[in-house]
Amino acid sequence: MTSRKTIAVLFGGRSGEHEISVRSAASVVQGLSVVHDVLPVLVDRRGGWKLQQPGPGVSGEGGTPVFLVPSPSDRGVLRRLEDGSVIARPDVYFPVLHGTFGEDGTIQGLFELAGVPFVGSGCAASAVGMDKAFMKGVFASVGLAQARYRVLLHYQREQARQVVETLGWPVFVKPANLGSSVGISKVKRAEDLDEAVDLAFEYDRKIVIEAGLDAREIEIAILGNEEPEASLPGEIVPDREFYDYDSKYSAESRTELRIPAPLKEPEVRAAQEIGVRVFQAVDASGYARVDLLMDRQTGKMFVNEINTIPGFTSISMFPKLWGAAGLDYDELLSRLVDLGLERHHQRRGLRTDYR
């Protein structure tokens, strides 16, 4: 395990998942503070960075405006926006940013330009893991089973009915670039399709229409870099039609998390193997949660998606799956810091010259 470090935790962000990010960061900052010195950095809804008081707490507002220079020569320091003076010197950056401008490769690209160590996947893996259309194309290229789907761009809106005639009912209509089930609808009738398509296009210029499966929702937590490990599977038993935003985050939700999932040993092994294949297919690093669908009649496993920055509250599926394996929350966070440093050192060893 790494020695005590100064870790900048970025949270909030310019996305529909801003509040979820704040919740995750509250748990992450508290857990990291057991071993490390933590600098909470709020990314507000306009994209401004606000350095908050060091310690185990976070706030959804307030802080000193700061910025990071995208050059290795500046050594990853945080500077005051007001006068450019150095205010903090993080050793590692830990993005706990869900959705666009945080989980989609943009912030990871900034970290890579700045030459700083950071937790999680790099720019390309994050971008693929965020965009459901690109993600599904990558999965198909390595032979991973998926539900049938079609991708529509905003100018193809009128093709939605034709797509559903091919896929059959029910269908899921999803924004291509958003998580936490924001903007997703399950549609069973033709008269409800336009409303679902309009909602999805409010969040993205590209949407995915996917055939609905009668399936159990199985999740796998993956940890590692070049030799990733898979947790035992967990199962989501939602309290409504599907695992939507309210099922995930509402205090009134009665959604059940089964850890471990009640599966036969061959099913457990199959889920773990698929989880690792998915992680490696997008070239992920550090950690991810892989969501699978298991057909209730045949038991066949289908890949739903990979989440390269999964929810990280103390009751979220990712930490709970590793907790069931004996890796407690604080230890898990320190392991992620170690993996981020490991990836950084590997990348620093690569040549950047031609001759």
Segments (PLM) and residue ranges:
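ATP-binding N-terminal substructure of ATP-dependent carboxylate-amine bond-forming enzymes
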Residues: 1-124, 128-130, 134, 141, ...
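Phosphate-binding site of ATP-dependent enzymes
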Residues: 188-273, 296, 300-302
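A glycine- and small-aliphatic-rich helix-loop capping segment at beta-alpha/alpha-beta transitions
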Residues: 109-118, 189, 194, 324-327
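Active-site nucleotide/adenylate-binding loops and adjacent lid/helix of ATP-dependent enzymes
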Residues: 2-11, 15-16, 23, 84-87, ...
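ATP-dependent carboxylate activation and anion-phosphoryl transfer catalytic cores
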Residues: 2-5, 11-14, 141-143, 264-355
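Hydrophobic beta-strand scaffold residues
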Residues: 38, 117-118, 146, 171, ...
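Conserved hydrophobic "DFG−1" position in protein kinase catalytic cores
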Residues: 80, 222, 292-294
